Amino acid sequence: MIKVIVCGILGRLGSEVLAACEKSGDIEVVCGIDASAQIPAEGPPVFSSFCTLLPEADIVVDCSAPSLQSQVLGYCVQKGLPLLSCVTGYTAAQKQLFSNAANQIAIIRCVNMASGLPQYLHMLMETVRVLQVPYAEILETHRIGKKDTPSGTALLIADMLKQAGCETAISSVRRRQARGSHEVALYFASQQIVLRHTVCSAAAYGEGAVPLIHRLMTLRAGLYELP
C-alpha cells in the first residue's frame, strides 16, 4: 500500500485526488494538509500545516497553492519524500526552487493530470509540424474562481507552439459553471483548424493522479516536467 499525504486536501483538486486514491485499492491517504477551518468529520486526519507529528508516508501530493511551496518542499526534502506537484502559477524563482530540491528527491510537476491531454498535445503539435502553422490562438475557459490566468496548461501550450516557431495569442474566459477547456485555432494558408480538449468533470484530474503516484514511486531524484 502506497501511503500519501495530500496538501490542499479540502480544495477542489485535493478532494478529487483523495476520492481517486480511495478507489485505487493500493493507495492510502494517511492525512491531509489544509488551512481551512472546515475540517471534515470523516476521512483521513487533516492538519493545518506540516509538522513533525504527521503519519509516515511514501509520497506527498501537492494540490494547494504557490504560497505553500516552501513548506511543501521543506518537508519533502527533510523526510526524503517524492513530490507530485499539481499546482500552477509559480514564478520563475519558485520554479528554480524545484530544480534545487530535485537534487535530493524525485519531483513530478504536472500542470494538468487529465489522461487525454498528452494525446491532445501530440495531435496538436503534429498538425503544427506537418502544416507548418505560422500562427495560433489559444482560448482557455475555466470556472470563475480559478486562481491563475492564463491557465498553466495554456501557458504550456503557448511555450510548445513558440518552440515550434508558431506565433501565439492567448485569451482567457471565466464562467460560473464552465468546464475546463483548451481550444487552439491554427491559421495557415487561408485555412483554419480548431482542436479542443475539454475536461467534463474534475474527477478526471484526480483519476490522472493515480498512475502518476505509481510512476513517482519508481523514479530517482530529479525533476520530471509533465503536461
Please give the residue ranges for each predicted region.
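Residues that mark the start of a beta-strand
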Residues: 1-3
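C-terminal substrate-binding/catalytic lobe of Rossmann-fold NAD(P)-dependent oxidoreductases
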Residues: 5-7, 12-51, 131-227
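Hydrophobic beta-strand scaffold residues
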Residues: 29, 46, 83-84, 107-109
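Rossmann-fold NAD(P) dinucleotide-binding segment
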Residues: 50-59, 67-86, 95-97
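Rossmann-fold NAD(P)-binding glycine/threonine-rich loop
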Residues: 73-74, 87-107, 118
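Rossmann-fold dehydrogenase core element
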Residues: 82, 97-114, 131-136
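Short alpha-helices
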Residues: 112-123
